[in-house]
Amino acid sequence: MSQGAKPGKGGMLPGRKVNAEIAKIRGIPEGQDSISPNGHPEIKNPADILDMIATVRNATGKPTGFKAVIGAYGWLETLFAEINHRGIESAPDFITIDSADGGTGAAPQPLMDSVGLPLRESLPLVVNMLEKHGLRDRIKIIASGKLIVPSKVAWALALGADFVVSARGHMFALGCIQAMQCNKDTCPTGITTHNERLQRGLNVADKAQRVANYNKYIHYGAGLIAHSCGVTSARELRREHVRIVQESGLSEPLDKIYENYK
């Protein structure tokens, strides 16, 4: 539905990265910018989202959901009410909530800087809305957006996420140096380029081990934080385990700042 770095806009793959293989797959001329629309023409309202989910689920037989960065949230109220009207089996299997401060290789600067809600607001908001509509057990919540260290992963789970995903963390594990050349096809580390000469700089065997080590550390670190909070796993973390420092310099637990959930 939308991405944190560019809510309200579709994707753009610069022409210099549209090689013969991509051109064939997408059905566009080689070397031409590939502009994706900012929405699906089949989806005009929240009810259409459920129709599309049913279509994809029936075609693939796999769990189906959607990803969105949250801004105005009235459409979610309508969506959840429609689910209860149709029946709980019509619900998406998951919703991925992307933070407004998420990253991308190409997006307009005003959208990256100023549009959408950060995860600290949108995640508890959506979790509470699911509780309100009795859908919390049916729909799983996936959190994304700069969740690259164990403390951030533990924080997201405490706020109500069922899962956490991270693109940025894995890019760092691969060796990303933030050269800011993703859109130019000149990534010096070989990660985001289609240039075969530059790609040779990415040693797959070496980077595979680094990525494995990164994931192992994330799991270990999140578990370590959970044990320090007195629970046996990170999935048992709740808002009461997290505190936020206020302007006064004193901290408040999240279950006081946000209405808690079961």
Model-predicted segments: where are they?
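Flexible glycine-/small-residue-enriched beta->alpha junction loops
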Residues: 1-31
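Short helix/loop capping segments that flank catalytic or ligand/cofactor-binding pockets
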Residues: 6-10, 105, 235
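N-terminal leader/propeptide and maturation segments of large enzyme subunits in energy/redox metabolism
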Residues: 20-29, 39, 43, 209, ...
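Short capping/connector residues at structural and topological boundaries
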Residues: 23, 27-30, 40, 45, ...
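Short glycine/proline- and acidic residue-enriched helix-loop micro-motifs
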Residues: 31-39, 201-205
